[in-house]
Amino acid sequence: MRGYARVVSHPEPRLALLDGGKRDFPYDEGLPVPFGVATALGGEETPLAGASVTALNDQHAFLRSDAPLPVSIGDVVSLGLSHPCTAFDKRRWLPVVEHAGSTRVVDLVRTFF
């Protein structure tokens, strides 16, 4: 399961703030894991090797790395989510994508969590 968040601030070379936090992503079984970054949702992703989400607050994620992050404000970061149950309780509808890695939505599933 993946979530997506935009880069809203890049105040330091090794720190970026994303527009998703505890209200958006599950965190009880681990923080989101960054997979890649693209200039737009569905765009070609550049891997974020060595990057990690180190903290979440209500509405933001803190993306950090030992090396400068290859991100710009407005970029979209894909995140692996640790626990589906606490993702389902945040949404009434979940998109179903065509295949793993795709952003083409082919169906919606209603949740009753």
Predicted regions and their residues:
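Active-site anion/phosphate-binding pocket segments in diverse small-molecule metabolic enzymes
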Residues: M1-F113
